[in-house]
Amino acid sequence: MHSRPGSLETSCGFILLNFDSILLLQYPQGHWSFPKGHVEKADSDHHSTALRELTEETGISEVSIDGSWCEKTEYTYVRRGRETPKQVFWYLAETDEIDVRLSHEHTNYLWLQLDDAEELITFEQEKETLRSAREHLRSSGRNL
């Protein structure tokens, strides 16, 4: 369900861990980000949106979601000549799967250590989201 330009868009995505690495996807425009996508009418909640998008974009469908952490980012971008507000709900998940089948929406992927991922992520808000996730993991006894 894509909204009209100028109306609030909502997306959901995962910071996806595999042991001590996280998954980043590269978009055709060149930027690197986490798997995410727009909420659709058939989605029952934000977790189902994030999981559907993860599966569509990477082929990964088996994840364990950390329900104790969520981060919301908000920003505005230009779509069809109009400023469009967007909110993204980020969740933390883990998987044992490492093989990625990229969709047509992306050109590359990398599993990276958190420090390397933070350097590669294009947008500052997403770097901050990664730092927040890392703090949550550390407070839960994970040292990444």
Question: In which residue ranges do the predicted regions lie?
Answer:
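Acidic, metal-coordinating catalytic segment for phosphate/diphosphate chemistry
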Residues: 1-13
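Conserved Nudix-box catalytic region and its N-terminal flanking loop in Nudix hydrolases
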Residues: 18-60
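Short loop segments at secondary-structure junctions
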Residues: 19-21, 94-99, 114-116
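Active-site segment of metal-dependent pyrophosphate-handling enzymes
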Residues: 59-98
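NUDIX/MutT-family hydrolases
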Residues: 90, 101-133
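C-terminal alpha-helix
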Residues: 132-140
